[in-house]
Amino acid sequence: MKPKLTVLSLGAGVQSTTVALMGVHKEIPHMHHAIFSDTGWEPQSVYDHLQWLKPILEENGTQVHIVSAGNLRKDALGENPDITRVASMPIFVKNPDGTKGLLRRQCTLEYKINPLMKKQRELVGLKPRQRWKEEEHHRMDLVMGISWDETQRMKDPNVPW
């Protein structure tokens, strides 16, 4: 069995950057890996910040992985001929009765969470569709930065790490 890993879910915002730098400064345990899930449609400031942060993490022993499920903007605009359906984005719409509504959000799952999960499984040595054995649970600690005003986003994981 592989040794236990500590992996940061890196959004390159304030919270995950703070956690990453706390690891660099040894205020919290070392993180072996950091994973950034690129939608292809992040603000330029996020890419600039990631370009600044990545070498700091790598110089301190944290391997940074950039994963992607494609370019959300191009997929949504139909610019990718290989895409037959696009995950819905939280876009404001006008309903047939004239009321305002919000489309259901699927893009976070398909363009952020699924690529992160795929990389996490790879890091712990699981092949596609391979199941965990009970004695192999808890091979990874996943670290996420969530501020106090976002505690409603915290959930128990649906995976055994």
Q: Each predicted region: which residue ranges?
A:
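ATP-dependent adenylation/nucleotidyltransferase module used to activate substrates
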Residues: 1-161
